[in-house]
């Protein structure tokens, strides 16, 4: 559909949230300035080719950004075949952006027999409200999920004891959030309130651990590209600008937010979107849900990372730094952070004094780097020599700690 539109119009500016595969057509890419509001995996290949304009917008602000910054006047989405009453359904992928249908002048939709009819809020539109329709039947994209590795499982093991029966889950994408979801089989009366519902959460629903009247999401990224009747019957689809509103999300009881990040400093500043000055991802819903969890009664947020990463030359570097390096950005401020978790433990930083934060962060760093981090903190006047002395003797690398 996008290719056809681009062929007929000299210049088309594309503003997109999370799905950019249509731009892989050379006809589209050559003639469409592309603005990404998230910069997902599919978008990153466009960084190398040029023509990508990056933005980092909190997901609950995406519709406002599209309206006020980009002045989007046309919405293009894929929809289901109409039902007996003439309603087209946005399905498990398109509902996230459906709020835009009230903000634009034109709605050009592609009917796809493989798009499924979902339930929820603002999840459908009557055919009479659509400017133009075309048709292209094709299977929906499938999403491959890497199974959690041993390190992911170690990180999840520090979170699982802090999740209670009856809590409400928001988990992100990746090995660590998947490990958390898999580890919750056997729990009771859990709710799911998440922007992206993944295969791991679908399996959690099927395990019996979830109260099926408490499942809401904006996007479903399933491995099959097709939801079964069980999932369709129990997932309520909500536009992302509505679901991610921190004030709405905070109404969920015991909101548990689990997301990944790239690095953090000793005071708890978290970078989840840039490496060496290059935008790698976007803020997405991380900050939305960190703030929502803090407001939720009994809520907790967990930002997770491996304690180290290995450079191409084999050099091991700590992902916990005394200070964020040049080129890093602060995705989640330290004043919002609750828990930061590595394979070495979970550091509870919420409203803690700076020296307490620094000691907690050093304890969850890899043992090889703890002494050096403590010395840097002393040199910067952030930690007293007496407090730093506890890190002079390092535990064995296999020893785990919890703060």
Describe each model-derived feature in a short phrase.
Residues 1-403:
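Conserved alpha/beta enzyme-core scaffold
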């Amino acid at each position: 559909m996008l290719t056809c539109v681009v062929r007929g119009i000299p210049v088309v500016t594309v503003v997109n949230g999370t799905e950019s595969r249509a731009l892989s057509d050379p006809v589209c890419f050559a003639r469409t300035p592309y603005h990404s509001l998230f910069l997902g995996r599919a978008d990153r290949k466009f960084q190398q080719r040029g023509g990508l304009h990056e933005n980092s917008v909190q997901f609950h602000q995406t519709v406002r950004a599209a309206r006020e910054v980009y002045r989007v006047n046309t919405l293009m989405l894929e929809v289901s075949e109409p039902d007996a009453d003439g309603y087209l359904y946005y399905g498990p992928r398109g509902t996230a952006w459906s709020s835009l249908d009230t903000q634009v002048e034109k709605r050009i939709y592609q009917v796809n027999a493989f798009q499924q009819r979902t339930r929820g809020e603002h999840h459908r539109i009557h055919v009479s409200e659509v400017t133009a329709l075309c048709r292209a039947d094709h299977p929906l994209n499938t999403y491959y999920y890497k199974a959690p590795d041993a390190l992911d499982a170690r990180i999840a093991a520090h979170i699982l004891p802090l999740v209670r029966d009856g809590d409400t889950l928001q988990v992100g994408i990746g090995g660590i959030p998947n490990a958390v979801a898999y580890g919750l089989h056997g729990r009771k009366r859990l709710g799911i309130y998440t922007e992206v519902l993944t295969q791991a959460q679908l399996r959690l629903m099927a395990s019996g651990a979830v109260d099926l009247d408490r499942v809401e999401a904006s996007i479903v990224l399933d491995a099959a590209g097709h939801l079964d009747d069980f999932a369709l019957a129990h997932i309520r689809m909500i536009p992302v600008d509505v679901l991610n509103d921190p004030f709405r999300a905070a109404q969920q009881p015991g909101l548990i937010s689990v997301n990944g990040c790239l690095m953090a400093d000793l005071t708890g500043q978290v970078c989840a979107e840039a490496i060496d000055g290059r935008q790698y991802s976007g803020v997405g819903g991380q900050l939305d849900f960190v703030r929502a969890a803090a407001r939720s009664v009994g809520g907790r947020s967990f930002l997770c990372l491996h304690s180290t990463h290995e450079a191409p030359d084999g050099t091991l570097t700590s992902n916990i730094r005394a200070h964020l390096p040049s080129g890093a950005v602060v995705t989640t401020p330290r004043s919002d952070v609750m828990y930061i978790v590595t394979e070495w433990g979970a550091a509870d930083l919420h409203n803690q004094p700076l020296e307490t934060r620094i000691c907690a962060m050093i304890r969850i760093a890899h043992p090889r780097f703890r002494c050096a981090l403590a010395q840097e903190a002393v040199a910067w006047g952030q930690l007293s020599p007496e407090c730093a002395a506890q890190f002079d003797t390092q535990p064995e690398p296999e020893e785990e700690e919890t703060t």
